[in-house]
Curated annotation (Swiss-Prot):
Entry's localization field: Nucleus
Domain of life according to the entry: Eukaryota
The protein's name in its UniProt record: Probable protein phosphatase 2C 30
Enzyme class of the recorded protein, top EC level: hydrolase
Source species of the chain: Oryza sativa subsp. japonica (Rice)
Cofactor needs: Mg(2+); Mn(2+)
Regions of compositional bias (Basic and acidic residues) in chain numbering: 42-52
Short name of any one Pfam family annotated for the protein: PP2C
Record region (Disordered): 42-72, 321-369
Biological processes annotated in GO: abscisic acid-activated signaling pathway; regulation of intracellular signal transduction; seed germination; seedling development
Biased composition (Polar residues): 330-343
Gene that this sequence comes from: PP2C30
Positions annotated to bind Mn(2+) 2: 111, 298, 390
Amino acid sequence: MAEICCEVVAGSSSEGKGPECDTGSRAARRRRMEIRRLRVVAERGAEEETSGKRRRLDGGGGEASTDEEDREVERARYGFTSVCGRRRDMEDSVSACPGFLPGHHFFGVFDGHGCSHVATSCGQRMHEIVVDEAGAAAGSAGLDEEARWRGVMERSFARMDAEAVASSRGSVAPAPTCRCEMQLPKCDHVGSTAVVAVLGPRHVVVANCGDSRAVLCRGGAAIPLSCDHKPDRPDELERIHAAGGRVIFWDGARVFGMLAMSRAIGDSYLKPYVICDPEVRVMERKDGEDEFLILASDGLWDVVSNEVACNVVRACLRSSGRRERNRSSPTSNLSPRQSSSSGDEAPNDGAPSAAAGSESDEESAAEEDKACAEAAVLLTKLALARQTSDNVSVVVVNLRRRKL
């Protein structure tokens, strides 16, 4: 590694002479460029040393192609917001864990009811449970990608529900700031929805339990990746009746006139009518068509359609792309002195352009994160302007490929 670094520095210091300019300024700028080159070479070497040690869930045990290896280091670009809105209490929770598994990113929205502690626990624990279950499933033979992820998500939701039920029965104390500690010792009326997405090199995995929702924008079309679990959904209504439960229409369809969803984490007082089984969907990613993914609580979806939400996010991301292109296009904005200095400090050995490109990529990635956050905020403002009565939580994930 040291020899490579020395060769880069030696090669760059002996090549290329440009027009006359301030030698002090040139020397200082040259030193900065050499430091950047060293950093880029060192980072590349570290990536090469660790890439062979990475454990992947995708691939089924075969050798990864070069394209798949490139996708492993895809950077997560996302933004989110969560606001109380017109509610007295904030009961939503959001989770974003880029790189929680090698080459995979985790995102989740959890909409609590009764209190916040189940949603908070989901936000803190769900990704950890998925990591455990994914590790246990990594050695499963004879299962395709969809079946493996379906099993991982079903077991993860069951474990999360068991933890919530244990908390409601007093086996685990509620959080110190939880208002349930001032109520009954058994807080079995508390629960949460859960919609989670795992973004991998080749697939998007979405698991949903409740009425939070995931929507994919592909080729300009809004594609829902989850279906709300409402008590009056025909298959859910049939399941509840078969279990001996009733759906009463009181301010909308509710299980026994109380809960406005038919599946949730927690809510032990309504089991077995309200279950925690997620519906899992595994979508193969399509480069050039997949644009972004939206996860949000029903505080958004009650007042904003899938299509309108996708149009808002697309406008934000396109606006950001135009700003980025305007910044990166022209050397016409540089003075003659700046242009000549840049040309002098970028000999044709390739290393300086890599360093400059690395810095530019970091700026572009930061701009894309900012655009996703702005899109999430704009959706939240739209929901509030349309008089949503619930907490609003939104996660926006950019699906356009950009590798590290």
